[in-house]
UniProtKB/Swiss-Prot annotation:
MF annotations from Gene Ontology: ATP binding; UDP-N-acetylmuramate-L-alanine ligase activity
Gene name tied to this protein: murC
Pathways per UniProt: Cell wall biogenesis; peptidoglycan biosynthesis
Name this polypeptide is given: UDP-N-acetylmuramate--L-alanine ligase
Catalytic activity as recorded in UniProt: UDP-N-acetyl-alpha-D-muramate + L-alanine + ATP = UDP-N-acetyl-alpha-D-muramoyl-L-alanine + ADP + phosphate + H(+)
UniProt lineage: Bacteria, Pseudomonadati, Pseudomonadota, Gammaproteobacteria, Vibrionales
GO cellular component: cytoplasm
Family of the protein in this entry: Belongs to the MurCDEF family.
One of the Pfam families matching this protein, by short name: Mur_ligase_M
Amino acid sequence: MTIQHTQDLAQIRAMVPEMRRVKCIHFIGIGGAGMSGIAEVLLNEGYEITGSDLSENPVTERLVSKGATVFIGHQASNVEKASVVVVSTAINEENPEVMAARELRIPIVRRAEMLAELMRFRHGIAVAGTHGKTTTTALVTQIYSEAGLDPTFVNGGLVKSAGTNARLGSSRILIAEADESDASFLHLQPMVSIVTNIEADHMDTYGGDFETLKQTFIDFLHNLPFYGQAIVCIDDPVIRELIPRISRQVITYGFSDDADVRIENYHQEGQQGKFTVVRKGRANLDITLNIPGRHNALNASAAIAVATEDDIEDDAILKAMAGTQGTGRRFDHLGEFDTGNGHAMLVDDYGHHPTEVDVTIKAARSGWQDKRLVMIFQPHRYSRTRDLYDDFANVLEQVDVLIMLDVYAAGEKPIAGADGRSLCRTIRSRGKVDPIFVPEIEQLPSVLANVIQDGDLILTQGAGDVGKVAKQLANLELNINKMLG
């Protein structure tokens, strides 16, 4: 069914004239991926945007270049001009700007509430799930852009083809990553919802109860109107179990024989995945996907399912898949660098859950079977390391060389036995790989100088600051020996 998406921004804005009473929108923690995306869209819609963060980064610099005012550090005076204050769950009630906003009776809304306001009169496509949200959001965006539909998008990571994680488009389409970590995705009311998979993560939000998490995903899908569409991965056992409880139109995708949009004949050639997509009532598509891994074939088939239901031309789908550059820090091939003894291939990946690490390892093994796999892993959060300890050990022992950093706390207090040193000790006791523990990230160059060999594939893995190491290595002006100097 073809849907008309050409309504312009002026028409959308005219639907909510009251929103124009808001003059200045202030974001606390504006440098975060999710917050900055919404801030950039609102900035481009003509609102005055201010924000604060603890330090400058490329995201804050980009916002300033576009006209935002960004304060470094949190203080009460930062909110004095604000009509509304936007916060993420990382911001607590004792934050001086939150306290000042309450004192001044300035409305405080969560990030997802502001995203929901952007989506309210648009054709919203929301992408949820434990893993794959960012890449799937980028792939949906790529298809709609290739089809000339100029969508607005708000993603949790850099869409490399666009050079940003958010953009204001001219059509009524809004494609957004939906965050389940704090259950705030329940604020969204999209027309189409994708759920990629459901695993036990962020369990503190759900009282440690997996059934509560599952019900929350069902509630998210039931936010769809009765004519909306739920696009779900039938390969995921939890989703398969939940499908009978979803009272909306359900379209499935996956490798499974009973998927409505089915992947066949997947194989990987280096950086590219190649496969056939079989669709009911439509021609098969022979896909060349410019990012590797079976997990990315699943992400692509979710995007293809959405595009097929929206009657987007196959040519646009094929071009988008072949032309995608992926997303920042998702199997991000940063090139090669000089080891001093030759050259090593460098890949940076954000994955920080055992399932995400596992599929990254499998993609590396499938595409570069002749290379020794060296992983620099930084656990993310003590609570996640504790809750998934054995799963991490099972996954990490698959690599040839494991260099382990200590836990990136992300604001958490240490938990005994749930740190990098303990995880190393457990993996070493199993006898498959002898991990090297590096307590301080600054010590990595000297360790790498003694480990890296010509022809290695190096994976920097994790959601913390290990990505900074990847960027340093990717600077081809440097080699390991110069880093030591």
